[in-house]
């Protein structure tokens, strides 16, 4: 109610290892609270590392999404690592096309995980450059307007 009284939308991020960690749980929570001021911050990587596909997650969650960010990953939960976009094999083209098919028109941004930031050789400028190049190429190859 506090957010609604100020016209603020809150975005919850389903997260691997958390109690809200799959499409069913976040959709149940949204249904229980039933507020137009509660949406999803959709990070597909948290679904990918537990084996939930783009085709399963995107159609369910994109209609309730107010923001999304992406990063790469390697491995499967519990033995996984988040990576800089472009360091892994995530299919950004397929993801962008799936988001577009749902009518999502909001922001899609890159996230650099704390796992990456803790690397002794972490370079934020190199991470930003790789992220930009990776996502820019993906948008172009997907035929999705960056708006």
Predicted regions and their residues:
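C-terminal helical cap(s) of enzyme catalytic domains, especially alpha/beta-barrels
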Residues: 120-146
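Hydrophobic faces of well-ordered beta-strands that scaffold small-molecule active sites
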Residues: 10-12, 38-42, 66-70, 106-112
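Active-site acidic/histidine proton-transfer and metal-coordination neighborhood
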Residues: 1-40, 49, 142-146
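Gly/Pro-rich active-site loop or hairpin
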Residues: 19, 23-27, 31, 46-105, ...
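Generic helix-packing signal
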Residues: 7, 30, 61, 132-135
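Short, flexible helix/strand-to-coil boundary loops that buttress conserved ligand/catalytic motifs
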Residues: 34, 62, 139
């Amino acid at each position: 109610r506090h957010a609604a009284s100020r016209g603020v939308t809150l975005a919850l991020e389903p997260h691997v290892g958390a109690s809200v960690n799959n499409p069913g749980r976040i959709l149940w929570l949204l249904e229980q609270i039933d507020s137009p001021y509660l949406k999803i911050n959709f990070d597909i990587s948290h679904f990918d590392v537990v084996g939930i596909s783009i085709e399963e997650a995107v159609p369910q969650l994109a209609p309730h999404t107010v923001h999304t960010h992406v990063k790469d990953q390697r491995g499967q939960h519990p033995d996984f690592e988040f990576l800089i976009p472009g360091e892994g094999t995530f299919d950004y083209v397929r993801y962008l096309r799936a988001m577009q098919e749902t009518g999502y028109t909001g922001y899609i941004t890159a996230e650099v995980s704390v796992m990456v930031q803790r690397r002794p050789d972490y370079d934020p400028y190199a991470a930003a450059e790789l992220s930009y190049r990776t996502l820019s190429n993906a948008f172009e190859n997907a035929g999705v307007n960056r708006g």
